[in-house]
Amino acid sequence: MPRQFPKLNMSDLDEHVRLLAEKVFAKVLREEDSKDVMSLFTVPKDCPIGQKEAKERELQKELAEQKSVETAKRKKSFKMIRSQSMSLQMPTQDWKGPPSVSPAMSPTTPLVLGAASKPGLAPYDMPEYQRATISGDYCAGITMEDYEQAAKSLAKALMIREKYARLAYHRFPRTTAQYLAHQGESVPLEEGLPDFHPPPLPQEDPYCLDDAPPNLGYLVRMQGGVLFVYDNQTMLERQEPHSLPYPDLETYIVDMSHILALITDGPTKTYCHRRLNFLESKFSLHEMLNEMSEFKELKSNPHRDFYNVRKVDTHIHAAACMNQKHLLRFIKYTYQTEPDRTVAEKLGRKITLRQVFDSLHMDPYDLTVDSLDVHAGRQTFHGFDKFNSKYNPVGASELRDLYLKTENYLGGEYFARMVKEVARELEDSKYQYSEPRLSIYGRSPKEWSSLARWFIQHKVYSPNMRWIIQVPRIYDIFRSKKLLPSFGKMLENIFLPLFQATINPQDHRELHLFLKYVTGFDSVDDESKHSDHMFSDKSPSPDLWTSEQNPPYSYYLYYMYANIMVLNNLRRERGLSTFLFRPHCGEAGSITHLVSAFLTADNISHGLLLKKSPVLQYLYYLAQIPIAMSPLSNNSLFLEYSKNPLREFLHKGLHVSLSTDDPMQFHYTKEALMEEYAIAAQVWKLSTCDLCEIARNSVLQSGLSHQEKQKFLGQNYYKEGPEGNDIRKTNVAQIRMAFRYETLCNELSFLSDAMKSEEITALAD
């Protein structure tokens, strides 16, 4: 059956939800001009709705519920369901794994009173460790009505996330899917795994252009900011596109409104705040009870330790992937070995390397890392414009164009040589991998062919690198310079060459080859930039966005996701690799950015603003959305190191990894990723198991292929819980994996049990 995008109408949206969503956007627009950047991440420790009036309201509701016969029935049925769920989650001595069918049922499948589910056997042993169990009232401090409302709303949000993830071939955890799905309904494995091209074998040429599949001759046209595919001219004239899921803006706005309304709902905020506090406390208790058991498990694991487990730098920009000393050394080397080489042309006059430095009145011999001035310092804190200037060595854009760009007189040779030196260092380390970002701006469709040519001509491929394309959100700059007529043209320049290379790879061999090693897209720029526009179904379509105003963040994300979704389905149909959408999100700016990413992104970079929204933070936990965090980068730009939420997120069970962002600006040593791990371990006193868990997360989040992940993490890495962990490869204790899995199942069971309770009450009536 063809995959189609399920559509909704604005008329389906509840008026109360619509008003709440608009209030959130309006509040954000008001706050953008008045907020104090220094208090951006200051979050009160008390409960979000813990004021006196709210507490009194909750108390009155509790007292009213105690007198309600209907509530008494619901509580009784819920306690029975909860006891069954708990019995399934707590392994017995003979228990060998999780139930073969999820203990959770669909709300449309009522539980038969008195029936008990039987856990099936799984082919692995559940580790023995000390578990902490909470019994008694299911939600002290929150009424049954509020609890059921919060649980149903959270479950609906997860279902919305699952819909967008499945359609774009993004990842969604199988455990969460099973708790949301109908009983016995299994989620196909291939649906949950992105399709990355495996690395070439040692005897294969990574630059071979002869394996392109045949051309299809499909036609592509942009409509409303999204590229549509047509089988032939006749189908184009009939407006009958090729059978692929095409996004619908109205549906997206309805779904986003539901999430926006949810994050402002008082009872839901209270419930999520309490659950997050519980998760953090539960991990502290787990550490106290099982730290030595985990350590013994790691000590008995031969050959493997923190140094020789695979780690991936999941967020790094290619233009700053080398440290400042490396850049300085390379500049001096090129000046010493080829000072008379022609490196630029200006007004028809060829310029040598010596003349470039003479025009800047400097001698490379006298340069130091301090005079190079590419490191972020105190003056860049809350100054993104000052940070961007650090990409210019000694403040000279000429040196940036010469050494850190792919398009220049030398065809990006110097930049390629430096990237290859960084790649060789990774290969020598054996256990470190990297996912550098290369820029596509959307000024011209020729950017893609130029970038692919740079990659092949300079032989930049490395088995320890996978590439991500970053799209800077700077349409306003190009429009003001009359380089683009509309935002739609920018989208077309970014995505049309990819569709053409997918449909007719024989005609675009270089780009087809380059795309094998590209695993995702990123959206980058200063998130704190103010936008006066509120994205809605009434927003102008991209081809009509002709003003010099930059579209808001959520506008960028929707149209990037929409085109990636169609492209991924087309490529999957052709048996080609697919792409993940991995935007920068939650570093600064509005909380609505994280709502947009919740719907559209496979994973995000930074995520600091999750600290401000308990509902979103809890949703990111339940959906296990990967977050690549860069505390050293944040320390120089937005948030001092000690206040970074990485440790807190890790303890709660969010899927976090460590990344460097920009080693040239933030790091001092040759191994920037190890520097990141070392500082985190020292500041937060992370254990070996903590570090190895973060490293394992980084491999799972990365664009490494299925075959590589099996080699680095174990044959069953895609399974969740201890069954998916091979301690011989990951050095993560099975006790830790079992704790994470059982805790997630427990949190998910709260949602499913609330929905079952409602069904049983209705059945009894």
UniProtKB/Swiss-Prot annotation:
Annotated metabolic or biological route of this protein: Purine metabolism; IMP biosynthesis via salvage pathway; IMP from AMP: step 1/1
Modified sites of kind Phosphoserine: S85, S106
Domain of life assignment: Eukaryota
GO MF entries: AMP deaminase activity; metal ion binding
Positions that bind Zn(2+): H315, H317, H584, D661
Tissue: Expressed in adult tissues such as aorta, heart, kidney, lung, muscle and thyroid. Weakly expressed in thyroid and not detected in liver.
Cofactor needs: Zn(2+)
Biological process terms in GO annotation: ADP catabolic process; ADP metabolic process; AMP catabolic process; AMP metabolic process; ATP metabolic process; energy homeostasis; erythrocyte homeostasis; GTP metabolic process
Pfam families: AMP_deaminase
Cofactor binding mode and count: Binds 1 zinc ion per subunit.
E.C. number(s) listed in UniProt: 3.5.4.6
GO cellular component: cytosol
UniProt keyword list: Hydrolase, Metal-binding, Nucleotide metabolism, Phosphoprotein, Zinc
Reaction catalysis annotation: AMP + H2O + H(+) = IMP + NH4(+)
NCBIfam families reported for this sequence: AMP_deaminase
Family in the record: Belongs to the metallo-dependent hydrolases superfamily. Adenosine and AMP deaminases family.
Summary of the function given for this chain in its UniProt record: AMP deaminase plays a critical role in energy metabolism.
UniProt subunit comment: Homotetramer.
Protein name stated in the entry: AMP deaminase 3
Organism annotation: Rattus norvegicus (Rat)
